[in-house]
């Protein structure tokens, strides 16, 4: 019998976040996120106040499905052009880690 669940989580995971686009519908974009343990997540949340949107995203992301290359400059362009992007991405990250919306 194949085991599908492991106690050791993968170092990264992928999830889609809906990026708000002014004047239109939100667009789902797939991101690759860093995994954090429960204790690491608690510490990250405690120290998140005052962190810039760019720094927050650099702290949780390792990649994305966009045709633009992933990096600090591209993240800066993202948060400058789409003000709701950072909150949407961080919310999705936290949601995935705590499994808030898992259901039937």
Protein language model regions, located:
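Short, charged/polar N-terminal "headpieces" of proteins
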Residues: 1-46
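Acidic, low-complexity intrinsically disordered segments
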Residues: 45-104
């Amino acid at each position: 019998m194949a085991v599908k669940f492991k106690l050791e989580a993968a170092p990264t995971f992928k999830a889609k976040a809906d990026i708000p686009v002014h004047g239109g519908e939100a667009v789902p974009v797939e991101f690759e996120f860093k995994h954090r343990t429960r204790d690491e997540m608690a510490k990250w949340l405690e120290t998140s106040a005052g962190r810039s949107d760019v720094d927050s995203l650099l702290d949780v992301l390792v990649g994305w499905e966009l045709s633009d290359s992933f990096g600090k400059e591209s993240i800066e362009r993202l948060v400058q052009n789409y003000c709701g992007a950072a909150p949407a991405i961080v919310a999705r990250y936290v949601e995935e880690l705590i499994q808030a919306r898992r259901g039937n």
